[in-house]
Amino acid sequence: MVVLAASITTRQGKPLLSRQFKDLSKDRVLELLSNFQNLVSEISSDHTFVEDKHVRYVYRPFDNYYIILITNRQSNIIKDLATLNLFSQTINSYLSSFQDQEIFHNAFEILSSFDEIVSMGGYKENLSFTQVQTYLSMESHEERIQEIIERNKEIEATEERKRRAKEIARKEHERKHGFMSSNGDYDGANRFMGSKDPNVTNAINSYYSHASPAAQQSYLQSSHAAAAEVAPVASPMATSQRAGHSATGGMKLGGGAGRRAGAAPRPSAISSASSGTPPPPEEDVPENNGILISIKEVINAEFSRDGTIHSSELKGVLELRINDHDLSHSNLKLADSIDVRDKSFQFKTHPNIDKQSFLSTKLISLRDKSKAFPANDQSLGVLRWRKVAPAEDDSLIPLTLTTWVSPSESQQGFDVIIEYESVLETELADVIFTIPVFPQEPVDINTESSTCSDAEVVNMDQEMGTSIKISKIAANDAGALAFTIEAPYEDALYPMTVSFQESTRDKLAKSFTGMAIQSVVMANDHDQELPYDVITSLKSDEYLVQ
């Protein structure tokens, strides 16, 4: 067989795409396609080929279009039909709907598939549909492995830079403040630390309760250090008694001296290292009244210190949870607020979901109409999406950030102001700013410059750094968080990490990107609507200020 050309035309005879495999001019191809239109209008729709004096047209109609192979009259018609079937499969894999614009948009991929199926001499390659897809994807296993290796190297290098920065900051603190053992008060307390005489203990507590704040902090650290040294050889009862006595002494000392408003006490290095960051609480399982739809989105973003957006990425998932078998034969209709044909989104349906129905009618339904969704009250992800915005594009930014840093006049450190602005229609909860430093002095939250009155230090340790929490940021609210923190140099304050979350339970709620549910209907009767609930949520994953 020899294929002269492969073309796509409308039923009215308008040529859309054509690929010539022999030396045919454009005018000659247009003339042949015009002749085909005249021939096909004179025969019934049951035929699959027509001929004139010079060539044979093997064709297949689909919607308002024709796929046409122009061959010589001596070509094997059986092989021509097999080739036409392969062309049809390949074209269908690229088109979500049969429209002129969709065909033009995927013209490069369609023509490339033509070249894979038929060589330039007009002879069909011995390929299957799967092989054509593999060749067109142009994936390389070795290239993927190399990309993974390079990505892992970048991650390791980033972690190593952070670790070295923390180590430099720690050494700088030690160099500035010296070791605690050089402090005279520490040595004096250490001589009597092993004494069990209650008179000696009371005398030491009484002395340090009226001492300076620096001396009090030194004494507390020495107490923790002594307890840590004795702990391995002490009995459990004795350990608990010493812990209780130490806590009592700490309360007495803490009552003798005041702190500035908003200042948070600094826990000792030993207590912080042993306790670590408390594990996050387990999420409550929301109540399900029959059909519960969860729309979850996670945002990653990176800002410069002046607020410029370097990158942003959003990932989302739509989960379906059913606990009633009578409601399992259902379909989900998406609202008009989301455009499933938006090329800036990457949508991916579950393998059991009818993708054609999703793209054409925004309907989430099973491919096998005889089956139903599981009614085991377990969440099932049926749709995922991803969107990446270019630099300086704020379309995926729910919370903008700008930082201002200046040397502090009151102590060795920096005055930091973090300006923020929320663009959400709902409030953000549990907004936590984490600075990767572990200061020796307490963090002072400036209540005069801060617009958030509930800001507080919630964690300080050598591994995570210092975390300051704002319980909530109102919808479309802008404000500032101001504080003074000790750091060896300005770059040690970065990268700052911000975490937040937002959740709404409302049937009419829509996600940050506009994903929402219009209705839930029976699979066999779209006029019968079913009751359902919707929960939308937005969380940050890696939200950084570099």
Curated annotation (Swiss-Prot):
Extra information: Present with 18000 molecules/cell in log phase SD medium.
Domain MHD: 288-546
GO BP terms, alphabetized: endoplasmic reticulum to Golgi vesicle-mediated transport; Golgi distribution to daughter cells; Golgi inheritance; Golgi localization; protein transport; retrograde vesicle-mediated transport, Golgi to endoplasmic reticulum
Tagged with keyword Transport: yes
Bias (Low complexity) ranges: 260-276
Leader sequence segment: none
Membrane association type: Peripheral membrane protein
Statement: the UniProt record of this protein carries the keyword Ribosomal protein: no
Gene coding for it: RET2
Keyword vocabulary terms for this entry: Cytoplasm, Cytoplasmic vesicle, ER-Golgi transport, Golgi apparatus, Membrane, Phosphoprotein, Protein transport, Transport
Gene Ontology CC: one annotated term: COPI vesicle coat
Protein name: Coatomer subunit delta
Compartments, as annotated in UniProt: Cytoplasm; Golgi apparatus membrane; Cytoplasmic vesicle, COPI-coated vesicle membrane
